[in-house]
Amino acid sequence: MGVIEFLFALAQDMILAAIPAVGFAMVFNVPVRALRWCALLGAIGHGSRMILMTSGLNIEWSTFMASMLVGTIGIQWSRWYLAHPKVFTVAAVIPMFPGISAYTAMISAVKISQLGYSESLMITLLTNFLTASSIVGALSIGLSIPGLWLYRKRPRV
């Protein structure tokens, strides 16, 4: 993939990630003045995950690093705009949730219950379930680490 194609794919990924970020921000009753920042943060998070995955990192570590970036930027923006960091960060990480792998794991579980045990279905179930669980764990831990680092009151040593 050339540089121009990558930049177009990145722009498309960021624009398409901003839409559900705004949608979930509206569901969570985020103030109207913060909606554009939720969209921008969702685009930054998903775009940074795409850049990390393109550079060779797997999806779990890419999601972890992107959610740490979202958490750090959200804390900084909360100081500037006098809002809680969750106003910006929670809606911004929702586009990174593992819908496809969770859905595939669920479908494999349903097929196992209908058709009986099959080694290939069980491998599909476990692989996708572990991937989805790892991504959700990476999102939650990565989103909470910047707050633990930046709001720490005691000395680090």
UniProtKB/Swiss-Prot annotation:
The lineage of its organism: Bacteria, Pseudomonadati, Pseudomonadota, Gammaproteobacteria, Enterobacterales. The keyword Repeat does not apply. Involved in succinate export with YjjP. Both proteins are required for export. GO terms for cellular component: plasma membrane. The transporter is composed of YjjB and YjjP. It comes from the Bacteria. Pfam families: ThrE_2 (PF12821). The gene is yjjB. Belongs to the ThrE exporter (TC 2.A.79) family. Its main location: membrane. The keyword Cytoplasm does not apply. Disulfide bonds: none annotated. Keywords: Cell inner membrane, Cell membrane, Membrane, Transmembrane, Transmembrane helix, Transport. It is a multi-pass membrane protein. This is Probable succinate transporter subunit YjjB. The chain crosses the membrane at residues 8-28, 50-70, 87-107, 129-149. InterPro entries: ThrE_2 (IPR024528), ThrE_Dicarb/AminoAcid_Exp (IPR050539), YjjB (IPR020914). GO terms for biological process: succinate transport.
